[in-house]
Amino acid sequence: MAKKSSIEKNNRRKKMAKNAAPKRERLKAIIADRSKPMEERFAATLKLAEMPRNSSITRVRNRCELTGRARAVYRKNKLSRIAIRDLGSRGLVPGLVKSSW
């Protein structure tokens, strides 16, 4: 089980990234638009740099919904490999069977 503080920090980052996404997109569009004057694009770059780092979606980590584990998390299930294995061995994941050959 991951530390509660790590899980909460990631949740705060998710919320902050979601709230700041439209503003970041507007600023990035201004920066990428070559028809705008250089001063306006540079001002947009400075505004983007002033925004909190945690407002970037890149800072959000995929975590397991059950354990909070940050590594080996399957995006489709939002579960770590360990959690899937545990649930699968208990027969709680439909269609998941232990392989044998």
UniProtKB/Swiss-Prot annotation:
Query: What is the recorded name of this protein?
Result: Small ribosomal subunit protein uS14
Q: Which UniProt keywords apply?
A: Ribonucleoprotein, Ribosomal protein, RNA-binding, rRNA-binding
Entry's family note: Belongs to the universal ribosomal protein uS14 family.
Q: Which residue stretches belong to region Disordered?
A: 1-25
Q: Compositional bias (Basic and acidic residues) at which positions? A: 1-10
Of the GO CC terms on this record, one is:
small ribosomal subunit
* Origin: domain of life: Bacteria
Return one Gene Ontology term, BP aspect: translation
- InterPro entries, alphabetized: Ribosomal_uS14, Ribosomal_uS14_bac/plastid
What high-level taxonomic lineage is stated for the organism? Bacteria, Pseudomonadati, Pseudomonadota, Alphaproteobacteria, Hyphomicrobiales
- The keyword Ribosomal protein is annotated on this UniProt entry: yes
Q: Which GO terms describe its molecular function?
A: rRNA binding; structural constituent of ribosome
**Which source organism does the UniProt entry give?**
Rhodopseudomonas palustris (strain BisA53)
Role according to the record: Binds 16S rRNA, required for the assembly of 30S particles and may also be responsible for determining the conformation of the 16S rRNA at the A site.
- Is Ribosomal protein one of the keywords? yes
Subunit architecture? Part of the 30S ribosomal subunit. Contacts proteins S3 and S10.
